[in-house]
Amino acid sequence: MEFAAKLKAMRQAEGMTQAEFCDQAGFSISTYKKYEASMFEMGYSALTKVVTHPRFKKYTLWLMTGDTAPECGQISPV
């Protein structure tokens, strides 16, 4: 699964709209839509906003590697 699809899967698993995700993560909606559409590659600063957010931390390992470690609280949204 490519990175953009993973972002979308995370957002949907949390039951969030794009606007709600952006509000939580601190992105503009226009920028986030470009991430989900694979038009922009997410840089370190933006990625850090996602993986350090308390609501999304549980997906960090999966987002970065595709792996999970449920025993460590690292899960997949799909």
Q: Where are the language model's segments positioned?
A:
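DNA major-groove recognition helix of helix-turn-helix/homeodomain DNA-binding modules
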Residues: G43-L61
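Short, conserved catalytic or interaction motifs in soluble domains
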Residues: A37
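Residues within the helices of the helix-turn-helix
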Residues: K8, A19, T48
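The alpha-helix within a helix-turn-helix
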Residues: R11, C22, V51
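Short alpha-helical DNA-recognition segment
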Residues: G15-K34
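A short, Lys/Arg-rich alpha-helix, primarily the initiator
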Residues: M1-E14
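Short, charged recognition helix plus adjacent turn
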Residues: T60-V78
